[in-house]
């Protein structure tokens, strides 16, 4: 264990401070599989941890600008070790006395930060996908008079969501048996946020088809572009028709702690439920998500279970038996990450981190707007920004192909790591600026590298 901690310490120092350190060492999938098969047969176990460090993606590298995976605070290594060793499942109080108490403290602080009044509450669960599913199950339980949980659907049901929302909302609706027709996707406007002017039209159209709408979801922000929906307008619409208003703040819900950017979440304080991932913008390891309710009774009533060997029948508020509220019967002591970060650093650490990364998104936009051979998809509202190399002499098809090839070349090169996305048929390079060590100089270097590679890929017919 001492050797591993020394190895990790050296890895972190080198990753952050050495400019030549790669973000990843690319291997083809079959080659990677072949390596680990052979290692299992003949490899020395002493080499296992060094190989893992060498053959994984380094999120602490300042040139990591890829997926929405948080750069973990080193102190969470210790909370993770403790959780893994003690292995308290938490479903019932006696299998998680401290973590159940700690989880309540954490969720109460989060509810207060959102702006929920008493009797708000919530719990931690394993990821935004599961949290969004659970929230929509709560919505159905609260807003549909028929007992769907025990008796099945009595009529077609539906939820409203922007077409740019994370795919997990679509997946949750299908898991719930709503079907394709039960997912009412409202178009996005030119800024890739829900077009609130079309809410009424899509609602009435669904009602005319016999679909009972029971919930509407606001993205804070959407995954592809990092754009925040107008939560205040959605809340007013939800109130008009007595719909459950859920905020998917998996990525950007942490902006509740940012004095500069908390306005992006205006309206969330009146939502019925909200999701915030700790492993995105709160510097925690995967996977930990808070699901918060404006009225905590909805958390208690979502699931009807018959598990006498676990829980005794009682009408009391058994907050200490978390298995009553979560989809999981067993979960990790993920609350330790939240509690320790809040205890050691306070809420100000999230204010500093979120504000710094969102500011960097704006700075990157300014940098791109000065470059004639780059264009952005939309002005960033967070630390997510979509852009592409462009050339007026090239067709849309050519540009899509060039940008895709540039991205693959960067992946194989390993110095930088970024991803790609398609928006209305146009392929963009997509950066999520998660790393607090990433600077303007790193981003300038990235653009220079993209430009150099892109120019080499311009078809000869265009060069001539």
Language model: regions and residue ranges:
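Conserved small-domain helix->loop->beta segment predominantly found in fold-type I
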Residues: 23-27, 317-356, 365-398, 415-426, ...
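Active-site C-terminal subdomain of aminotransferase-like
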Residues: 222, 266-371
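PLP-dependent enzyme catalytic core of the Aspartate aminotransferase-like
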Residues: 422-464
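A non-catalytic, amphipathic alpha-helix used as a structural packing/dimerization or gating element
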Residues: 3-7, 101-105, 109, 352-363, ...
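Short, glycine-/Ser/Thr-/acidic-enriched flexible segments
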Residues: 70, 164-166, 190-191, 221-223, ...
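Conserved PLP-enzyme active-site core in the AAT-like
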Residues: 131-300
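N-terminal entrance/gating region of PLP-dependent enzymes' catalytic architecture
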Residues: 2-119, 411-412, 416, 434, ...
């Amino acid at each position: 264990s001492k050797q591993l901690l020394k190895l990790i310490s050296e890895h972190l120092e080198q990753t952050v401070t050495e400019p030549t350190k790669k973000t990843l060492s690319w291997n083809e999938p079959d080659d990677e599989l072949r390596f680990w098969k052979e290692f299992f047969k003949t490899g020395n176990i002493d080499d296992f941890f060094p190989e893992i460090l060498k053959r994984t993606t380094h999120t602490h590298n300042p040139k990591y600008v890829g997926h929405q995976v948080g750069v973990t605070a080193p102190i969470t290594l210790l909370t993770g070790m403790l959780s893994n060793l003690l292995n308290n499942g938490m479903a019932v109080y006696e299998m998680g006395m401290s973590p159940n108490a700690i989880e309540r403290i954490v969720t109460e602080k989060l509810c207060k930060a959102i702006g929920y009044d008493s009797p708000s509450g919530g719990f931690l669960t394993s990821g935004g996908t599961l949290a969004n599913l659970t929230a929509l199950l709560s919505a159905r339980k609260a807003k549909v008079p028929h007992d769907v949980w025990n008796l099945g659907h009595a009529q077609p049901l539906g939820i409203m969501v922007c077409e740019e929302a994370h795919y997990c909302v679509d997946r949750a609706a299908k898991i719930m048996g709503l079907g394709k027709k039960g997912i009412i996707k409202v178009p996005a406007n030119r800024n890739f946020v829900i077009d609130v002017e079309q809410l009424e039209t899509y609602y009435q159209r669904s009602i005319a088809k016999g679909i009972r709408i029971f919930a509407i979801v606001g993205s804070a922000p959407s995954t592809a572009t990092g754009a925040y929906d107008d939560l205040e307008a959605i809340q007013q619409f939800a109130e008009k028709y007595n719909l459950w208003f859920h905020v998917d703040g998996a990525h950007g819900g942490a902006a509740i702690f940012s004095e500069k950017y908390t306005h992006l979440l205006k309206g969330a304080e009146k939502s019925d439920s909200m999701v915030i991932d700790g492993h995105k913008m709160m510097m925690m390891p995967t996977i930990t998500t808070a699901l918060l309710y404006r009225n905590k009774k909805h958390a208690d009533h979502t699931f009807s279970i018959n598990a006498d060997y676990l829980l005794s029948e009682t009408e009391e508020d058994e907050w200490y038996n978390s298995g009553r509220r979560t989809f999981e019967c067993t979960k990790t002591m993920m609350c330790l990450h939240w509690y320790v970060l809040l205890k050691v650093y306070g809420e100000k650490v999230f204010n500093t981190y979120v504000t710094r990364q969102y500011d960097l998104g704006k700075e990157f936009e300014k940098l791109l707007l000065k470059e004639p051979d780059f264009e952005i998809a939309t002005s960033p509202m967070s630390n997510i920004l979509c852009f592409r190399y462009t050339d007026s002499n090239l067709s849309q098809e050519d540009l899509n192909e060039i940008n895709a090839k540039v991205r693959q070349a960067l992946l194989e090169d390993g110095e930088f790591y970024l991803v790609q996305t398609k928006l209305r048929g146009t392929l963009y390079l997509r950066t999520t600026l998660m790393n607090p060590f990433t600077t303007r100089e790193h981003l300038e270097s990235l653009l220079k590298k993209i430009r150099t590679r892109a120019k080499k890929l311009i078809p000869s017919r265009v060069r001539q």
